[in-house]
Structures are given as C-alpha cells and as structure tokens.
C-alpha cells in the first residue's frame, strides 16, 4: 500500500513520511508513505493518479480548501469546515476528512469550553481551528489575519453557518486560548498575556517557534505543532487502516526527523 502527503515544498521538509513509516513498521503493515510536491495547477491530475495508485493521502498548504471540490465524498464535519487534510481512497473513490479539527478538539477542547479563543490565520488550518472551538463551546471566538478582509469573510461564513458569534479583529486581543493556524514560526503573532493555553500548528523548521518560547517563558501550557501533527496523523491512520497506532512511536520519529 502507498500513502503520501501533498503540498508545495514538502519533500525533505515534512516529517509525515518519517512518522507514518515508523508507525507502519511497528504495526507490521507493508506500506510506504512519501512526500510529493504538487503545484496548484497539477492538483486535478494528481488526484486522478491517486485513485489508482494510493490507499490514502494527507493534504497540506496550499491545497486543503481547493481539494474539496475534486473529491467524490466528504465527511460532514470536513464539508462544514470547508477544508480537507486527510483523504481515503476506497474502490477508486476519494473520500475527504479533516483530522486537523478532530486532533485539535481532542487535545484542547477542555481548555476551549467556555473560553475566549483567538485564532491567527484564515486558511485551511484556521477553518479547522474555528470548527474545533465552536464544537468545544467556546464562549467567544475571534479571528485575526494579516489580510483583514480574509479574516472578516471567514468570520462571517462561520457565524452564518453555525449560528454563533465569530468576530474578525484587526489589533491585539487578549484571549484564554490562542491558536496560531499559520506556518509562521519566527515572529510574535499574538498577545499571550492572560492566556492559559497556546496552540501552534507550525513545526517546520522547529516546533520551538518564537511564540512557543514566549508561552513557555510566561508559564502557559503549550500544544505545539508536533503534538498536533502526531494526533492528526494517528487519526488519519485509523481512517485508512482501521487500527489505533502508537502515538509514542510516531512522536519519537518526528522528533528524530527534526533533530530534537
């Protein structure tokens, strides 16, 4: 069986192959997972090839939203989110899921319930974070982005879809939970004063992002990009293979790949 992660600039940078191949070996499953750089214009062609050659694949930047329209079926939560990061190939049909959202919910829902949540970003990961925060019954959800208009459009879409108040904000906002749903790792993207939890989707080139270091300095609980990568990857393997993988093995493989 063959699996892959697709995106741009993922070959040699994504830790997913190391993580999944270590897991497959531990599970005794004869499978190989690779990273494939797929430009935007080649996405439709790749998907046709995937139907015949892959058992499943992960989707990362910049395809998480675009891929949805090419799939044969999409799980209800992923459809509501408007983004897919995990695809199962079943009888040559492409079925989409969002394990970014379910991973974040699994790891952080207890912190988000009744809390003010700030999400940085407006792409596929931000959509997953918005869904997880709403599902966890956050008290208030704010979204900020370098391009304010994108944050505003996303806030409006989710507010209408889920009948919950979601606000786009321009400036710094204090929140109980702060989530960086961008790949930015070397800059301060939000105010952490007053936060009890910081979540970071970024792990390349290191999970010790500038924001993670700031959170640790302030004594704030951290869920970093490796934690999220492992959890969403474990949930993806359960979808593909129907098994519960060993997350400890997966995390060890990621840390070794990153040289940590």
Swiss-Prot record:
The gene is aroE. It comes from Pyrobaculum islandicum (strain DSM 4184 / JCM 9189 / GEO3). Involved in the biosynthesis of the chorismate, which leads to the biosynthesis of aromatic amino acids. Catalyzes the reversible NADPH linked reduction of 3-dehydroshikimate (DHSA) to yield shikimate (SA). Homodimer. Gene3D superfamilies: Leucine Dehydrogenase, chain A, domain 1, NAD(P)-binding Rossmann-like Domain. This is Shikimate dehydrogenase (NADP(+)). Belongs to the shikimate dehydrogenase family. Pfam families: SDH_C, Shikimate_DH, Shikimate_dh_N. It catalyses: shikimate + NADP(+) = 3-dehydroshikimate + NADPH + H(+). The lineage of its organism: Archaea, Thermoproteota, Thermoprotei, Thermoproteales, Thermoproteaceae.
